[in-house]
Amino acid sequence: MKELLASIILAVVSLTLSAQNSSVLDQVKADPKKSYGNDYPYLYKHDTELTKAPKGYKPFYISHYSRHGSRYYWNESLYKQLDTILTEASKNGLLTAEGEAFYNRFMDAKQELMTGISELTQLGWEQHQGISRRMFDNFPEIFAKGGNVLAISSLSGRCVLSMAAFCQELVQCNPEIEIREQSSRFTLDGVVPTDKENPSKRSYPKATPRFVKNRDRAGSSDPLHNDILRRVFKSTEGLPFNGRRIAGSLMSLYTSLPNIGHEGMMGDIITDAEIAARWESSNLGSYSWVFSGQYEMIPVLEDIIAKADAAIDGSSGRIGDFRFGHDSCIGPLTVLLGINGADRDPEDPSEVKNIYQNWQTCMACNIQLVFYRSRKSPDDILVKCLLNETEAALPVETDSFPYYRWSDIREFYQAKCSDVK
């Protein structure tokens, strides 16, 4: 019977993943900005439908983790480096006409860019407002009567403001919701355990994905770097930094622009189609780092389990626990949880795109674990996982996808954490 159930579950999960990933490259063609990876601005699919809970089950609690919303570039090095390179090239007559036009637009925006380094943008604020309101609308049974919520964030301002946007919107939906917001070293272990300010910081082993030893199968030819340099510079001789680094910085700027309202700044120096053409290779690089750091997110998973237990037994009295952090946390957490097969660790590089797509770790990306209680048996708890507000598969057996028994999930993840320690 167990073998039959396992086969059924595998079939269901495979069909789910197939529906999501059968045309991954087609998805990139349809929306080339997805190839921006973790620079992709959050985009909610308005046609998303959620499966009704099995009869007799009612949602009562949500555990959530979200990345901050759209922001300016996260540190000053990119803007300073490009300022230095472009200014030197312009002074020495090394810019093409297209490069000079871009340089002028860049300098016009320079003060704004340098002032805004790492800060949340209006778009980032609005992303979290939308996620919050849809959460309220999707699960009215949880929020209708109000209740207590704990929200914690990293010490970064963009995360604190993302938390504020989300929580303010939720309270506007129902003023009876009481939210305690906290950005503190006391709570870092549950949201950014790797932060140097975390007094409980621990060391965990790094993991290496198996595809790395077969990376050469994916090929390494990438003419885009040279194409970009030819469009901007007559020559790069004598400029600080090597050509490949300069081209890489220009691509980093390009993919960041939609988050700060400056699309078009670079003209035709780079196109979405060109970024999309190299997406699969870029995605391999992304999978390497999210896979590598998965075990460092064990404290977050332990926090999720502990707070869920407290909500279930009533000791916390909360209807929600919300966390606001970074891609460096939610990406590895996605792998640790094995969402949509992200933990499968394929040997073939060409298979990686089918179990992880780096646009899923976009600006304001989020994981929601929604808990349902049986009206007949209070200890009978189901959980549904949403990745970016879309139902997702977990690596645990179930006979009612997308719903899983909390007892099974809890046991599975506790064992996974214990195996690493």
Q: Which positions does each model-derived feature cover?
A:
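Bacterial Sec-dependent N-terminal signal peptides
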Residues: M1-S23
